[in-house]
């Protein structure tokens, strides 16, 4: 076998008949498969051992030669070579056809490739191939045309008239002769001449023909090879025949299809030998043609060939296509050994980097390692005994297992894996039971809960794999989400509740006003019952030696609560003391108002001091983000573990729980409901008198009930007892929100109707009172709709992610700096008065392109090519800078990827991105993963005049990325100038808007229904909207330039996501949009060898033009094209990647005609052929590096303790530098 990691590229082409024969090990002459008595393969049949190799290892068919010592001998009795039986998966055979047949892919595809080469219509081709018409091949000296079609009758008449002077035939033979007559060079030259004058349809057709003919010419494929004389037979183990219990056989459909071809071929041979009448021979040839068509692509033409039970047989094409095809089922989605799956359960005692693995599962997963260890320790004499010992589960096996799994990470994966945090590495810990135990804090990244979710576990085997799992994938390192760089491991539920309860304050609790010398004394007082967790007390500030208090504060006493003193124990030693839940406290330390002088009376202070809010979920998240920023990964994961333990302990001790008595009744509810009923009655009366329309009545009724519900909700909130457990749970962010509470204690309100509107009758009861039957029934509509929407949305969102990944999978950070001189000017994105994305968010983690100047003083704030962190970005915003020119993926010059400088910071680590990072895939996952949170519906601006439907949510995202014409398209102006008039045109039901530019004046007619976005006298730039709605980006790219289009697409995507409260980094959207705009359509080839109308990558286009200019020619001109992501995926340079995405047969047909060469640049094509992917440590730059030895080699190179020490040291240095 060839080593896959050695070759550089892979090429596909048409196979000539000689090529097919050279692959073959022999001709299959009979349709037989295996003998029904002996079950041995028949000679010359589809499973013949002489052709395909022996069925048993090192054994010929007749049994004369057995054992490996006869390797390579061909048996003189049965003619079978003695070798391994696995050659039956590699050796091919062939069938010699008695008459040529056409390959259906090249005849039937759209456009028909054969039709283009011969310049004939597919319909006339079909008539010739399936023996309905004759075609004139050589008219001789008759007045007929070449390629003229003749019916049977016309043919006979012409034969009588002209005798044998002309040549006309039917079937694939005729096509083959015509194809052999095609002179490629001459045709190409003629077409190039024609193109100079051709217009319209004629030009399009000429360009298409030229494209195909040029492809044949360049690739060295012969057009006649589209007609086959010989058919390859794939190896028998790839189309197996197996015996089922009960003696019946199950066989692959391909065997049936091959049998039909062989039967018809043999019958045709016999008819030809007998000199049968031509009509019988023709019929047999047609049947042979149809049999071969069915073998290659069943069902492409006519009715598919069916097997038992009218099921269409699966042909060769079907073996490749779709989710169950070879590409997606076996090449991109392999199942792997050393894996298991089980239900997950919570493991609150685990450390952040650990997971619990059931004993039996671990024993099975690590079996080989345990066996080796048993033999090594002389606990078993050989491997066989070791295996027996394991199967018996002897006691000493468990001790060995404990030692084996030390230092060996395992991977846990939860489907659906929506982003890279769906697979993380953990250190296994053996647990009893049969469920995998998961650390509660990683649930958010996996989107896991413990209601029966399952997870898969995998064991990295090689040293490299273990090192990568440990260094790159350990759960404790994944604290930030790749999509927005915010912490993803935030405490939730019990942990939040525990810490909330811990940091609460209450007036007048036991021990209020006591003053302690340090935290230890506080803990002692708590344990002895002198103080309560919620008691407000004083602590001598100077007891906190490492905390950053001011000198003045250190002389005083700090007023805090017992719980907060405990909470601060888990924080890093020199982190500010946290006394109030504000960002100011996190960054700048405790405000002065919480300190009293040493002699001052603390009770007087506490009398007037308001209670400080406890720490809620959002605040805990802010703490984690700050700790991560200052102290880096290791300290943060320690803090998270401590916070988890503290939270669980405190929520257990607090005894917080929910009882039905905690749901209080609202006294004012009956009055509010009564008032609403009266108001609705009034509205109905107005409608009956004809004062208002039905629509207005409906809107007002809905409004009335919504107001009533809001009123009840507000009163509930006002009457909340802060110590009510339900209100504590909702307020802390642990579980539930205000609307849950309203439904429990207030009223449920209006329900959704099946048609998407609202029902006018509200559900007045709440769940505490109980619903009536009618109310219950009304609620079911909404509930059912919610379920179906979610299911549909999940599928849609998953498909969007798949397309995004496919289009961007080859975007990898390839180099440090591309040296571009262009940048992207960014400013805050606004929609009307609403801020969509502030400037700060757009600057963090990006490089500057130009110096940033202070708008007031003009001094340089930030130099060019500087990576902006949070502080720098904040400084720029505070200085009042409106827009900044940054390095952007849009303007990056790197071929096949991006450079470090244009990409900036890696969101998931907070450091500059490394060469080799697969940023395309990360971008696709970051956009696709929140897809399920977007709404499915298109919003309607209800009843507002001139408001058109705005598509939002998931449909809008798909519309943008697929570059479709938007719903509610806006009219844009093509000139810059002033709006001189807006006139009504009642006859056409339109308005005419006139724009006067510098050179010309344009008038645009817009429908009455659309809202006009401009007024007379406005100045307008080209590409701006005249009406409301979304701009069609394909129009924009024509009117403006690529940059404007890229910017528009970026801001549109951000609008959708940010409106739904999902933050995504700009750079992810930039990567996707750049992939949509990476092609150029060549308009005029100049002196290059490009054909007009070709789609080329920008990089290739520049390269060809550079060559043309160097050799003194005229460069080609082209215009940028915006492709939707599906189209862009199929237009990629890699045919393997495109074929495994969609439209497999079309992609392969086209690639083989062009003799395409796949350079194996992206990730997907390398996975398909099993080569190491060129990202991360698989980059060529890293692969060729020799390991350097620095100092002595440590034995425990992968030991966790060592790595933790190194990381702590490194984090310490980082922390120091950050603090300076």
Curated annotation (Swiss-Prot):
Q: Which Pfam families match?
A: RNA_pol_Rpb1_1, RNA_pol_Rpb1_2, RNA_pol_Rpb1_3, RNA_pol_Rpb1_4, RNA_pol_Rpb1_5
Q: Where does Mg(2+) bind?
A: 449, 451, 453
| Catalytic reaction annotation | RNA(n) + a ribonucleoside 5'-triphosphate = RNA(n+1) + diphosphate
Tell me its EC number(s), please.
2.7.7.6
What cofactor is needed?
A: Mg(2+); Zn(2+)
Please tell me whether the keyword Nucleotidyltransferase is annotated for this protein: yes
Instruction: Identify the keywords attached in UniProt to this record, alphabetized.
Output: DNA-directed RNA polymerase, Magnesium, Metal-binding, Nucleotidyltransferase, Transcription, Transferase, Zinc
Binding, Zn(2+) 2: 818, 892, 899, 902
Q: Name one GO biological process term.
A: DNA-templated transcription
Entry GO MF terms: DNA binding; DNA-directed RNA polymerase activity; magnesium ion binding; zinc ion binding
**Entries under Gene3D superfamilies matching the protein:** 1.10.132.30, 1.10.150.390, 1.10.1790.20, 1.10.40.90, 2.40.40.20, 2.40.50.100, RNA polymerase II, clamp domain, RNA polymerase Rpb1, domain 3
Give the family from UniProt: Belongs to the RNA polymerase beta' chain family.
Know the name of this protein? DNA-directed RNA polymerase subunit beta'
User: Which organism was this protein described from?
Assistant: Lacticaseibacillus casei (strain BL23) (Lactobacillus casei)
């Amino acid at each position: 076998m060839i080593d896959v990691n050695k070759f550089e590229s892979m090429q596909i082409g048409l196979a000539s008949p000689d090529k097919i024969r050279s692959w073959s090990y022999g001709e299959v002459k009979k349709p037989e498969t295996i003998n029904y008595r002996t079950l041995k393969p028949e000679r010359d049949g589809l499973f013949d051992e002489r052709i395909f190799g022996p069925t048993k290892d090192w054994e010929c068919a007749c049994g004369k030669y057995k054992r490996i010592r006869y390797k390579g001998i061909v048996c003189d009795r049965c003619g079978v070579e003695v070798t391994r039986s696995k050659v039956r998966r590699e050796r091919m055979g062939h069938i010699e056809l008695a008459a040529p047949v056409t390959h259906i892919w090249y005849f039937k595809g759209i456009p028909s490739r054969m039709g283009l080469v011969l310049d004939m219509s597919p319909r006339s081709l079909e008539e010739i191939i399936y023996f309905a018409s004759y075609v004139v091949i050589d008219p001789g000296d008759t007045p007929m045309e070449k390629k003229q079609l003749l019916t049977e009758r016309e043919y006979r008449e012409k034969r009588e008239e002209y005798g044998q002077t002309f040549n006309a035939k039917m079937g694939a033979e005729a096509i083959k002769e015509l194809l052999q007559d095609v002179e490629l060079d001459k045709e190409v030259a003629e077409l190039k001449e024609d193109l100079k004058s051709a217009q319209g349809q004629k030009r399009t057709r000429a360009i298409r023909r030229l494209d195909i003919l040029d492809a044949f010419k360049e690739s060295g494929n012969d057009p006649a090879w589209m007609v086959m004389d010989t058919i390859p037979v794939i190896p028998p183990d790839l189309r197996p025949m197996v015996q089922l219990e009960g003696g019946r056989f199950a066989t692959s459909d391909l065997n049936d299809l091959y049998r039909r071809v062989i039967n018809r071929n043999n019958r045709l041979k016999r008819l030809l030998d007998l000199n049968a009448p031509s009509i019988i021979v023709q019929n047999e040839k047609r049947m042979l043609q149809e049999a071969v068509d069915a073998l290659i692509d069943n069902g492409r033409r006519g009715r598919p060939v069916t097997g038992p039970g009218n099921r269409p047989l699966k042909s060769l094409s079907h073996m490749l296509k779709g989710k169950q095809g070879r590409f997606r089922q076996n090449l991109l989605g392999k199942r792997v050994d050393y894996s298991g799956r089980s239900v997950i359960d919570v493991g609150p005692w685990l450390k952040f980097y650990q997971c619990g693995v059931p004993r039996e599962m671990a024993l099975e997963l690590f079996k080989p390692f345990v066996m080796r260890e048993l033999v090594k320790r002389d606990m078993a004499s050989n491997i066989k005994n070791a295996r027996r010992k394991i199967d018996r589960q002897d006691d000493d096996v468990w001790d060995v297992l404990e030692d084996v799994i030390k230092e060996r990470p395992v991977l846990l994966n939860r489907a659906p894996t929506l982003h890279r945090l769906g697979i993380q590495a953990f250190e296994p810990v053996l647990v009893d039971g049969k469920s995998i135990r998961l650390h509660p804090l990683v649930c958010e990244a996996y989107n896991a809960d413990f209601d029966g979710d399952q997870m898969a576990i995998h064991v990295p085997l090689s040293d490299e794999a273990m090192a990568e799992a440990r260094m790159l994938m350990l759960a404790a390192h994944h604290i930030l989400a790749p999509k927005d760089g915010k912490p993803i491991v935030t405490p939730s539920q019990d942990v939040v509740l525990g810490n909330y309860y811990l940091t609460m304050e209450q007036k007048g609790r036991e021990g209020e006003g006591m003053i302690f010398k340090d935290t230890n004394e506080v803990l002692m007082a708590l344990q002895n019952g002198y103080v309560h967790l919620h008691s407000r007390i004083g602590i001598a500030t100077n007891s906190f030696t490492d905390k950053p208090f001011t000198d003045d504060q250190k002389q005083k006493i700090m007023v805090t609560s017992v719980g907060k003193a405990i909470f601060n124990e888990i924080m890093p030693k020199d982190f500010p003391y946290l006394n109030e839940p504000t960002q100011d406290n996190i960054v700048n330390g405790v405000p002065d108002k919480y300190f009293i002088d040493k002699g001052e009376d603390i009770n007087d202070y506490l009398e007037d001091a308001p209670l400080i809010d406890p720490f809620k979920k959002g605040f805990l998240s802010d703490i984690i983000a700050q700790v991560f920023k200052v102290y880096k990964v290791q300290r943060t994961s320690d803090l998270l573990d401590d916070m988890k333990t503290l939270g669980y302990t405190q929520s257990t001790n607090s005894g917080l729980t929910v009882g039905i008595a905690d749901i209080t009744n609202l006294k004012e509810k009956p009055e509010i409901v009564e008032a609403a009923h009266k108001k609705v009655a009034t509205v109905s009366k107005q409608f009956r008198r004809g004062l208002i329309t039905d629509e207005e009545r409906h809107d007002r009724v809905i409004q009335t009930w919504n107001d009533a519900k809001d009123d009840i909700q507000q009163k509930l909130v006002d009457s909340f007892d802060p110590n009510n457990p339900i209100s504590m749970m909702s307020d802390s962010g642990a579980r539930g929100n205000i609307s849950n509470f309203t439904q429990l204690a207030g009223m449920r309100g209006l329900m959704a109707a099946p048609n998407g509107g609202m029902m006018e009758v509200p559900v007045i009861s709440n769940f505490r009172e109980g619903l009536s039957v009618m109310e219950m029934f009304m609620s079911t509509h909404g509930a059912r709709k919610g379920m179906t929407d979610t299911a549909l949305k999940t599928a849609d969102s998953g498909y969007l992610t798949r397309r995004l990944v496919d289009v961007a999978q080859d975007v990898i950070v390839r180099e440090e700096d591309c040296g571009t001189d262009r940048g992207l000017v960014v400013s805050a994105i606004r929609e009307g008065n609403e801020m969509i994305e502030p400037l700060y968010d757009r600057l963090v983690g990006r490089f500057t392109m130009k110096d940033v100047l202070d708008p007031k003083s003009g001094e340089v704030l930030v130099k060019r090519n500087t990576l902006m962190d949070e502080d720098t970005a904040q400084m720029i915003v505070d200085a009042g800078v409106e827009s900044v020119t940054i390095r952007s993926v849009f303007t990056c010059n790197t071929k096949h990827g991006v450079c470090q400088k244009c990409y900036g910071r890696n969101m998931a680590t907070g450091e500059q991105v490394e060469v080799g990072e697969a940023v395309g895939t990360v971008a696709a996952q970051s956009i696709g993963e929140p897809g399920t949170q977007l709404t499915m519906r298109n919003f309607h601006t209800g009843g507002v005049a001139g408001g058109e439907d705005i598509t939002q949510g998931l449909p809008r995202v798909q519309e943008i990325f697929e570059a479709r014409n938007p719903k509610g398209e806006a009219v844009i102006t093509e000139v810059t100038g002033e709006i001189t008039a807006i006139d009504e045109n009642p006859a056409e039901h339109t308005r005419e808007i006139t724009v006067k530019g510098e050179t010309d004046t344009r008038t645009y007619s817009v429908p009455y229904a659309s809202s006009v976005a401009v007024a007379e006298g406005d100045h307008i730039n080209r590409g701006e909207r005249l009406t409301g709605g979304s701009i069609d980006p394909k129009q924009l790219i024509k009117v403006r330039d690529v940059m404007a289009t890229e910017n528009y697409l970026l801001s549109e995507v951000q609008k959708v996501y940010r409106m739904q409260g999902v933050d995504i980094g700009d750079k992810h959207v930039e990567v996707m949009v750049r992939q949509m705009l990476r092609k150029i359509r060549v308009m005029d080839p100049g002196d290059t060898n490009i054909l007009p109308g070709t789609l080329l990558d920008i990089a290739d286009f520049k390269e060809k033009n550079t060559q043309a200019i160097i050799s003194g020619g005229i460069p080609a001109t082209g215009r940028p094209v915006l492709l939707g992501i599906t189209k862009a995926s199929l237009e990629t340079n890699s045919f393997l990647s495109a074929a495994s995405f969609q439209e497999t047969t079309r992609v392969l047909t086209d690639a083989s005609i062009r003799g395409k060469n796949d350079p194996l640049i992206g990730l997907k094509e390398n996975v398909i052929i099993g080569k190491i992917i060129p990202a991360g440590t698989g980059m060529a730059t890293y692969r060729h590096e020799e390991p350097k030895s620095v100092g002595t080699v440590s034995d425990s190179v992968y030991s966790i303790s060592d790595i933790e020490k190194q990381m702590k040291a490194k984090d310490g240095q980082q922390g120091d530098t950050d603090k300076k």
